[in-house]
């Protein structure tokens, strides 16, 4: 790997880390057949109780920041060749996939509101990460498609790329938006905090006592179980060999 490429990677990492106050430190460097980066983040929790991915309860309201799914559309676009002068939805899709923004400000404000019981970033897709939010306590969720933040531009991009917008939104991943379980009794406090979110926040469903995730379509039908889009799997089952 050229030294210039490595320098560019570290400059990009520094730019991405700057809003959080994270400082990049040196480490072991060695030669290998391919470029491999191994990163460790070390820090401390300040005053107050940290918000983890555990703690959701039945009846909690589910909110997500930003517009998940754009990164999935960006990947589909780039697989067809990188546009030389992207504009409109093409530029938005490429930005979402190549330069995602961590929601530092939103996370801090949400935690300070005292209304968020559990929180996780959307890196593997909403359905996969929502499962992580619910599985420890054996809970489920009901989501409503009509409330998903899918803009006209998002739907136009999905149609142009041949990607189901529901699949992109629920299973895309690499958006790094925040998915939060909000206590209903403290919803007003959360909404006050959300006014300061640059990315905004949208209510997409609620936590249920019954396990499993169900999605109510706009036409009134339901998606659940194997019919749901799948997100990224870190340990997918091995493919069967065909003779």
Where are these regions (language model features)?
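Phosphate/diphosphate-binding glycine-rich loops and adjacent basic-rich segments that engage nucleotide
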Residues: 46-99
